[in-house]
Structure formats: C-alpha cells, structure tokens
Amino acid sequence: MDRVRPLAGGRNVRIREAVLNIDPYVPGKSKEEIAREYGIEPDEIVKLGSNENPLGPSPKAVKAAKRELERLHEYPEPLAPPSLYEAIIDYLADPPYPAGEPVEITREHLVVGGDGADEIIDVLTRVLVDPGDPVVIPVPTFSQYGISARACGAEVRKPRFDPERGFELDEDSLFEALDREVRLVYLCTPNNPTGNRIRERVVRDVVEECRGVVLIDHAYVEFADHDYTPLALEYDNVLVLRTCSKALGLAGARVGYGIANPELIEHLHRIKPVFSLTRPSAAAAEATFRDRDYIEKSVRLMIESRKYLYRELRKLDRLTPFPSEANYLLVDVSNTGMNASEFTEELLKRGVIVRDCSSFEGIEPFYVRVSTGTLEEDRKFIEVVKDVLEV
C-alpha cells in the first residue's frame, strides 16, 4: 500500500511504497567533498575509492569532446551516433585487453546508455519486471541492481558470495533462488566489491536454467582473466553489460553499452530515454575506443597497481586483502580494532579516499575497497595505512 506524505506546500502526494523502501545509492566520496570537510587541498588528496582510471582520459577523447562543445545548442543523436556504434563493434571484434574474447556483432546487437551502465540496468529491469516478480541478486554486489529492481516492486532473492570461502559465489543458495518464475538474474563478474569472478560453468548453468534474462555485468572485464561477452551471442536470454567508466577513463562522461540479441535490444529501445547520450560524451567514447595504445597502457598500469597493492597489503599483519580480477582490492580490516567506517575516517584525515563497503548489502562492516592508482598514489596510500596502524 502506498503512503501519503505531506510536502512543503501542504499537499498530500502519494509516494509508492516500493520507493520508500529503497536505501539510496551511496557513492564514493569526491576530492572536493573531502577538501571541504578536512581542509585539505584537492591536489594533495589521493582518491582510491571509485575505481577510476588514474591516467585520466585519453587526450584524444578530450580533444574530440571539446570539438562538440560548439554544438551544444543542437540535440544529439536520439540513441547514439553511427560512428560510435562502429567503434564499439570494432573494439569488440579485436579487444585490446589480456583476456579479450573477440565477438562479431552488428549495430542491432547494441544498446548505448547515456547515464553509464546504470541507465541500461534500469531500462532492462523496467522492460522485464512487474510488481511481485522475483529477481535474483547475489550479495554483496553493485547496489544499483537492487535499487532498480525494488523500484519496480520486485521480490528480491539474495544468494550470497561466501566470505568464508574468499567470497566465492555459494552455488547452493544461488540455485535455490532460481525457479521458472524468475524474470531477471544480475551477475557481476568480476564482482563489485569483492573482485572475484563467477566461474563460467556456474554462469552457463544459470543461463540455461533461467527462463528469464541473465544480466552479466562486465564493467571490469578489461582487467580480468575471463571474458563472457560471447555468451550474449550464444544465448538469447543474456545481456552483457559494459562500461566506458573504468578502463576507458570516462567515468565523468557516463557512457555504457550492452550486447544482446536484437529482439531484446529492440524492446529496450522502446522505453530507453532518447537524447540521453550527450554530444561530448559520444565523441569522447568514440575517440577512446579507437585509441588502443591508451587502453592497453591503462589496463597494464592498473593490473600492475593491483599486484603491487596486494603484495604490500599482505605484508601488514592486521589487514587481509582478497585476490582480485578487477581494478580494486577488497580488504578485511577487522583485525585493526576498527570497523570499516573508522578505518576509512582515519585515512580521510590523512588525505586518502578508499571505499567503506558497509553500505553494500550482505557484507559485514569490516571491509574496505581500494582502487588502483599510479605508483606514486599507491606508495602514499601504503605509507598512510602504516601510519594509521602505527607500523
């Protein structure tokens, strides 16, 4: 039943119960926010909290975006420019990252989102889910799945990534949650925030058993040792979700894309907002997809950073980092005598931002997520952690 809430003007406005029961997304903290709160110059802050590309955007992307500023008075393409579709198609046909699996697709296999991958998550959920429909979201994972599902009034079933087994996905709880009524399964691999993969056999078993759609979120696939993108062509009930926010360095441009069978894509386009992809963002994305040297350099840097951080954090007795296939590490801080909130607060006082994972559903309040950085940023982070731990 919906509740009635009085607004400032004295009117009673009906707010849907499903909306009132949603916990809002908790984003990572920005440099500007920390600068205001702690009186630290933004240039002195090390931000390792939002899984961004520490190299910054491709210079070619910046140049391309600037060219489009002269046309801000004109609407962009309703969905995406044809040249951007072609750039994505070429990128997927010859992927410039270690585990990339080539796929041959057409424009009809693609949906491009102008609010990053979040837009596609939201549109896919609204296309498939009616109030009361069951969906499956293993936890802990990316919070946007639950927000979109609950906004549609879904019944959310929550199998778990098991912390006792290094956050491996618990197959028993996963398949107990699946039945013929499930409309949508959200699988993030590598998983955010844990960094580990979901094994291909498990993914295939879910896809073959599920009568609904399986969303495979590959936001971090450029850093991984696996690539399940070809499953979008092998199965008609799979959508593989990708983003330009991580390896491609365009988190601020908000560009995501999905690969699926053309019939499903057609249904997404029925309700996907038109003109949501701005001219500068589309131009920046196209230029980045074409800049293979930049992508290869970015991926190499972040994988090297991940290895360095894992190695150095393992040397500190009171911290437990988990192996990762993404551009971040999950770290257990329970042996420090602090919870995640207290630990991150100590880092913030010293000008270092990491992600307190307490807001993730299904995880104890003793985990932080550390993004990869430049070697200079990584070294400062380790020094600050040692200071906090008084090592």
From Swiss-Prot:
Coiled coil: none
E.C. no: 2.6.1.9
CDD domains in the record: AAT_like
Catalytic activity from the UniProt record: L-histidinol phosphate + 2-oxoglutarate = 3-(imidazol-4-yl)-2-oxopropyl phosphate + L-glutamate
Keyword Amino-acid biosynthesis: yes
Enzyme class label: transferase
SUPFAM superfamilies for the chain: PLP-dependent transferases (SSF53383)
InterPro entries according to UniProt: Aminotransferase_I/II_large, HisP_aminotrans, PyrdxlP-dep_Trfase, PyrdxlP-dep_Trfase_major, PyrdxlP-dep_Trfase_small
Listed Pfam families: Aminotran_1_2
GO biological process: L-histidine biosynthetic process
PANTHER family: HISTIDINOL-PHOSPHATE AMINOTRANSFERASE, HISTIDINOL-PHOSPHATE AMINOTRANSFERASE-RELATED
Similarity section: Belongs to the class-II pyridoxal-phosphate-dependent aminotransferase family. Histidinol-phosphate aminotransferase subfamily.
Protein name stated in the entry: Histidinol-phosphate aminotransferase
Gene that encodes it: hisC
